[in-house]
UniProtKB/Swiss-Prot annotation:
Residues covalently joined to lipid (N-myristoyl glycine): G2
Disordered: annotated span: 1-27
Protein name (record): Guanine nucleotide-binding protein G(t) subunit alpha-3
PROSITE patterns: G_ALPHA
Similarity comment: Belongs to the G-alpha family. G(i/o/t/z) subfamily.
Domain of life: Eukaryota
Chain intervals for the UniProt region annotation (G1 motif): 35-48
Region called G3 motif, residue ranges: 196-205
Post-translational modification as stated in the protein's UniProt record: Potential N-myristoylation may anchor alpha-subunit to the inner surface of plasma membrane.
């Protein structure tokens, strides 16, 4: 009988040891898990950062996956030319080519009959001719006066390639494609011995109430703000400047009680578009008090300081900022490497090892 008790207690001890080991493994895994929250206003580049994580850390997009973006790319291209054509009327700009009025009529007719994401050779030719019209180009130059996708020029300048038969989208085409994020999208990947769980949350105002569910246990927030949005208004409220909205949102996040111990990284995104725009449109359109030179460095630093100055706990909390171009894989790779080092450093600090 004694031996029975002995074998039972051996079994119990074995089970206890296994459970301890599992708890230890779980604790180690949890310690290595980084919960990253991507926040920012609509169209600030959050979803493009997520696509880059797939390219950099998850073997990229297969040909089959790239093909799945073809309909989105065609839809983006068609929506872009339609937006420019409609703005021609609103802004009172005339076509230069006598044929363009007929092309506009055909564009509307084909757009109404075509299923979303389709592209016929006839439609491709109509779009190409319209895009070449100097009136359309003049209207495109005034894109901040109406709503136009950032990817418009990328696709419209490359119509021969993207409308050719047998076209397979490449990773750059995928990165430039735009689908409004609704709800919360999670991406998981490993890097530098850490397990990342990245959450991309819709940026439009209607999507923001869903953010609250993600707040618990967040290691780091990456806040995306589009530098190039300083002369643009919101899709959902044309009275509100996009940069002002972004600053307002950043203020509420960086000073929120939920995030008092959370690392915050600011991605000042779309630096490529900003660099081009700042030579034509003065920053004072958004910040009337700005009297500095309208250069990339000066105007960019001024915007950066507008964000960083909102941090009410400067002594205790550092906000790390980077100028980014979310469609540039090498730039994102370099910046994310730096972000990961910040996370590791902050984790060591929390453990008292730094």
């Amino acid at each position: 009988m004694g031996s029975g008790i002995s074998s039972e207690s051996k079994e119990s001890a074995k089970r206890s040891k296994e459970l301890e080991k599992k708890l230890q493994e779980d604790a180690e895994r949890d310690a290595r898990t980084v919960k990253l929250l991507l926040l920012g206003a609509g169209e600030s580049g959050k979803s493009t950062i997520v696509k880059q994580m797939k390219i950099i850390h998850k073997n990229g997009y297969s040909e089959q996956e790239c093909m799945e973006f073809k309909a989105v790319i065609y839809s983006n291209t068609l929506q872009s030319i339609l937006a420019i054509v409609k703005a021609m009327t609103t802004l009172g700009i005339d076509y230069v080519n006598p044929r363009s009025a007929e092309d506009q009529r055909q564009l509307y007719a084909m757009a109404n009959t075509l299923e979303d994401g389709g592209m016929t050779p006839q439609l491709a030719e109509v779009i190409k001719r319209l895009w070449r019209d100097p009136g359309i180009q003049a209207c495109f130059e005034r894109a901040s006066e109406y709503q136009l996708n950032d990817s418009a020029a990328y696709y419209l300048n490359d119509l021969d390639r993207i409308t050719a038969s047998g076209y397979v989208p490449n990773e750059q085409d995928v990165l430039h494609s735009r689908v409004k994020t609704t709800g919360i999208i999670e991406t998981q990947f490993s890097f530098k011995d850490l397990h990342f769980r990245m959450f991309d949350v819709g940026g439009q105002r209607s999507e923001r109430k869903k953010w609250i569910h993600c707040f618990e246990g967040v290691t780091c927030i990456i806040f995306c703000a589009a530098l190039s949005a300083y002369d643009m208004v919101l899709v959902e409220d044309e009275e509100v400047n996009r940069m002002h909205e972004s600053l307002h949102l950043f203020n509420s996040i960086c000073n929120h009680k939920y995030f008092s111990t959370t690392s915050i990284v600011l991605f000042l995104n779309k630096k490529d578009i900003f660099q081009e725009k700042v030579t034509k449109v003065h920053l004072s359109i958004c910040f009337p008090e700005y009297t500095g030179p309208n250069t990339f460095e000066d105007a960019g630093n001024y915007i950066k300081n507008q964000f960083l100055d909102l941090n009410l706990k400067k002594e205790d909390k550092e906000i790390y900022s980077h100028m980014t171009c979310a469609t540039d894989t090498q730039n994102v790779k370099f910046v994310f490497d730096a972000v990961t080092d910040i996370i590791i450093k902050e984790n060591l600090k929390d453990c008292g090892l730094f």
